[in-house]
Amino acid sequence: MTDNCREDDDNLGTSGDNALSAPTQLLVTPPAPHQTIVPPLNFCPVERYLYRSGQPSTVNFPFLLNLNLRTIIWLANEEPQDALLAFCDMHDIRLRFAAINPEGGEDDNPWDGLTEHSIVSALQTIVHRDNYPLLVCCGMGRHRTGTVIGCLRRIMGWNLASVSEEYRRFTGSRGGRILVELLIEAFDTKSVTIDKANAPEWLATAVSASEASYVPATTYSIHEM
């Protein structure tokens, strides 16, 4: 019986040696393709499904796809880059032009022809929820975009200090343009028609709150003074 046990031990040892000496097969899984997600220059959410930025380039397109954009508002006299036009066409994104100065050309100073009509045109697109998700953009995403967003904040009932602070946040070390801030301050919020039933929920809520808190100025007749 001892010999049988010894034989079993020898067989076990041999089997173990074979197991250790057997070549190990490694399954190599190729790495997943790496896709860089880069937001456009000065990109920032404004409200739910409303965004702002500078002009998107091809490197930003994968990022934009994640937003499921329905509309892009382009604030400039010139057309955007061909790549952006093709991207919008390929993904069925509506591109709305809101020319700063419709009579000006590519070399025209945009601030010479800044009109309330151009701003109202952009805002009329923003206040309708069927255009969302929506991106507002211009060349750098600073002054032109900041003007439209600033006027939107006025409609929402923001005070001027808060509007100016948000505008300057995107203007960089040079600071804001006094012309822009004066235009935002003087903007007639009643020039934009808002249908609350078709407006984004956050806008309808803000407008209702602003209207509820509005206190008309007290007027006096000559006889009361």
UniProtKB/Swiss-Prot annotation:
List where Acidic residues composition bias occurs: 1-11
Q: Which UniProt keywords apply?
A: Cytoplasm, Hydrolase, Protein phosphatase, Stress response
What GO annotations for molecular function exist for this entry?
phosphatase activity; protein tyrosine phosphatase activity
**GO CC aspect terms:** cytoplasm
Pfam families tied to this protein: Y_phosphatase2
Polar residues bias: where?
Answer: 12-24
Keyword set includes Hydrolase: yes
PROSITE patterns linked to this entry: TYR_PHOSPHATASE_DUAL
Give the EC number(s) under which this enzyme is classified.
Answer: 3.1.3.48
Please tell me which top-level EC class this enzyme sits in: hydrolase
Residues annotated as the enzyme's active site? C138
An example GO BP is: cellular response to oxidative stress
Name its cellular compartments. Cytoplasm
Reactions accelerated catalytically: O-phospho-L-tyrosyl-[protein] + H2O = L-tyrosyl-[protein] + phosphate
Q: Which PANTHER family match?
A: TYROSINE-PROTEIN PHOSPHATASE, TYROSINE-PROTEIN PHOSPHATASE OCA1-RELATED
State the protein's name.
Answer: Putative tyrosine-protein phosphatase OCA1
Q: Give the organism the record lists.
A: Eremothecium gossypii (strain ATCC 10895 / CBS 109.51 / FGSC 9923 / NRRL Y-1056) (Yeast)
Name the gene behind this protein. Answer: OCA1
